[in-house]
Amino acid sequence: MTTTKKTALVTGATDGIGIPTAIELARRGFHVILHGRRDERLAKAESLVRAAVPEASIEHARADLSSLAEVRAMGRALADRHDAIHALVLNAGVFAKGHDKSGDGFELTIAVNHLAHFALTSALIDRVRVAASRDGHGRVVTVSSVAHRSGAIDLEGLRAGGRHTDYEAYAESKLLNVVFAAELARRERAANTGVTSNSLHPGVLATKLLKTGFGRGGAPVEEGATTSVFLATDASVATTSGAYFVASRVAPHHPSADDAKLGAEVWSITEALASR
């Protein structure tokens, strides 16, 4: 597929902050690929985007992020349809209660929040590189959480597919997001591709995830899209990479994100798991 518009993919675009993220990207003239698990939810999300931006250019991409086979298939299909992807917004996330497992046998929270996004990025990074080299705009934006600061990476547990309580798994998954984003930034910088990779905390928001995981609400979800859209579009961060943002500003992240050795280990383990 060729388009004169820049193209953005938003995972988890049918719920929470995914919908306002898609709306704001469409408002800025992007062709927006909405990801979701079910066709009816994607249709509803598209109707919400079109209600806000009638001229929006929209496409659907369906996959259950708990299934690596579905993630890889979606990645291949999108890579076949698009020669360039200018913004890859890794937004989807879950807070699974108990010790739920994915169909692949991984801890569900780790599978969706970390492994799926690694696999999807691996499938599409060449298209982001094309956007960076051809159009000067190739960005990977990873939605983490302030919860990452209370996380700890258990490499042996990660090799085993996760072995934590529900909150520990969530906090670790959000720390893995930040470590992944920083390691991707190092790799793309070393290869001089022009691709940037940053992570962010969207805020404490009234999402289904917050209610499920923490039993409370928060600020309107529309506010949570602000930093994601900023990192995906703003000229002021065109060359910023490897940083963590809160409220559209660089903020301190967990020291693990600066540990290149740990980043390489996490990458290697995740690559092996995601290729099963």
Model-derived regions: residue spans:
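Catalytic loop of short-chain dehydrogenase/reductase
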Residues: G93-K101, F106-I110, R129-A191, H201-R216
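C-terminal helical subdomain
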Residues: S173, S199, R216-H254, D258-S268, ...
